[in-house]
Regions:
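DNA major-groove recognition helix of helix-turn-helix/homeodomain DNA-binding modules
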Residues: 55-70
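Short alpha-helical DNA-recognition segment
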Residues: 24-44
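The alpha-helix within a helix-turn-helix
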Residues: 20, 31, 61
């Protein structure tokens, strides 16, 4: 049996918000980094309604000066899914 980690989207969104604020960046600053026409995607990430693409997570890690693993939050061990 294998235990499969599951990303906690809400906690990851909270973490993205925390990391953004810790670096002193605004949502508009991130919008400019990504070249987005609107900030909606970033707000969705922060609310846990959507996940950034892997490419965007790598950019966030570089901007926040952290690792990719520092951005993504997984559900706790008791909530991990088991598969055969």
């Amino acid at each position: 049996m294998h235990i499969i980690p599951v990303i906690d989207m809400a906690a990851t969104g909270i973490n993205i918000t925390r990391l953004r604020k810790n670096t002193g960046m605004t949502v508009r600053d991130l919008q400019e980094v990504f070249g987005f026409a609107t900030p909606q995607a970033i707000y969705k990430w922060q609310r846990g309604e959507a996940m950034p693409t892997l490419d965007n997570i790598v950019v966030l890690a570089a901007v926040f000066e952290v690792t990719v693993d520092d951005i993504i939050i997984y559900r706790n061990q008791n909530q991990l899914r088991e598969i055969a």
